[in-house]
């Protein structure tokens, strides 16, 4: 027999349950096109890293400044594997309509969350798993790493260039491979020596890796790590390097030759405008994959915006010649400019992974007359000829 206290308790429980259910319905409500849009970003590193996460956050700010109907929030320094908890926070507490996760290691957690919240819109950067409410996107640098490789091959005196990688995942292996293709094109006997640091942002590990490679005789540096540490360490030794993701010229003006600069805003502005207009919904994203390159202006080659190549290196690159099968005898400087023009053309008449391309064991991976598909590029796991060092 219920006492008055039991009845009050039961009513309280029922009221709480109803309110919680209503809250869930409200949070799960599908976005209505043309209404204010709230977007949450999840970053793997700190926004002050001056690399990957910093570039994404600059793009977020550009989007918010461009669209009066857009509100954004972000969470930084999220460990890969814990993204699901933060996605819950963005949806349950912040009320986000769209969640963008910006690291390869967030892929599985993002897919699980997309299935958990089928009425919300998700976008995952650098991955390949999609869902009706989950699209993928990438502003990829492999073309620019190839161009940087052309320059590195021309500049190395020891025939040992260096690439310090964060994690041995397809994205980084693709960039290393393109860099190696470029190096071998201008210096056939040169090598790309690899060190992994197993961190996206670790100035300490980056410094140790750079110093070890310098001790091994490497004299030109490329990398995937989200700080300017490597350009600073190389510069202190008078060695050239290439900036990564954000402009790094100011950290070593004499020795940053060029680099890769991301314009994530190109992707974000296009995607969010289409969500706002109703072109993209929580039901039609399974086949949406932004694979944006030079021709879409999602990436830029340069030591800093507007400076393709540091003027201090232009004369040396103009003096050094290579014999290209199609272009004939040409300076490295002119070759870089020609390849940049070709890859920026909408028809993209040249690609770094045009065959023949061999792996470092001598196996033909891309036959002559063919080029790697987007899927092959995004899942690459083999080392291009010329790469030296551990691969996992």
Describe each region flagged by the PLM:
Residues 2-13:
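Bacterial N-terminal signal peptides that target proteins for export
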């Amino acid at each position: 027999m219920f006492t008055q206290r039991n009845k009050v308790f039961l009513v309280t429980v029922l009221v709480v349950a109803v309110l919680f259910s209503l809250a869930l319905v409200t949070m799960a409500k599908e976005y209505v096109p043309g209404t204010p849009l709230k977007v949450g970003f999840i970053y793997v590193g700190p926004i002050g890293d001056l690399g990957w996460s910093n570039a994404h956050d600059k793009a977020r700010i550009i989007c918010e400044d461009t669209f009066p109907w857009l509100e954004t929030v972000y969470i930084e320094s999220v460990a890969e594997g814990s993204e699901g908890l933060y996605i819950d926070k963005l949806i349950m507490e912040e009320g986000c309509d769209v969640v963008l996760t910006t690291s390869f290691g967030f892929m599985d957690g993002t897919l699980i969350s997309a299935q958990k919240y089928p009425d919300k819109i998700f976008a995952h950067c650098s991955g390949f798993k999609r869902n009706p409410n989950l699209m993928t996107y990438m502003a990829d640098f492999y073309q620019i790493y190839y161009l940087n490789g052309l320059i590195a091959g021309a500049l190395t005196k020891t025939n040992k260039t260096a690439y310090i990688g964060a994690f041995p995942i397809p994205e980084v292996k693709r960039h290393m491979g393109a860099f190696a293709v470029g190096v071998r094109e201008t210096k056939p006997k040169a090598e790309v020596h690899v060190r992994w640091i197993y961190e996206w942002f670790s100035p300490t590990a980056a410094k140790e890796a750079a110093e070890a490679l310098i001790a091994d005789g490497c004299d030109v540096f490329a990398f995937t790590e989200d700080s300017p540490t490597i350009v600073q360490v190389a510069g202190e030794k008078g060695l050239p390097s290439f900036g990564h993701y954000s402009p790094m010229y100011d950290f070593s003006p004499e020795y940053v030759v060029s680099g890769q600069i991301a314009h994530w805003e190109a992707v974000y502005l296009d995607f969010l405008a289409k969500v706002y207009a109703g072109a993209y919904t929580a039901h039609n994203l399974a086949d949406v994959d932004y694979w944006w390159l030079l021709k879409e202006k999602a990436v830029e080659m340069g030591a800093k915006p507007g400076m393709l190549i540091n003027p201090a290196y232009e004369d040396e690159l103009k003096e050094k010649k290579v014999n290209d099968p199609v272009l004939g005898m040409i300076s490295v400087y002119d070759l870089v400019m020609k390849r940049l023009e070709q890859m920026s053309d909408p028809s993209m008449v040249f690609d770094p992974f045009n065959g023949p391309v061999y792996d470092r064991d001598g196996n033909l991976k891309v036959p002559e007359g063919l080029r790697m598909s987007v899927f092959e590029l995004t899942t690459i796991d083999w080392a291009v000829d010329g790469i030296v060092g551990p691969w996992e």
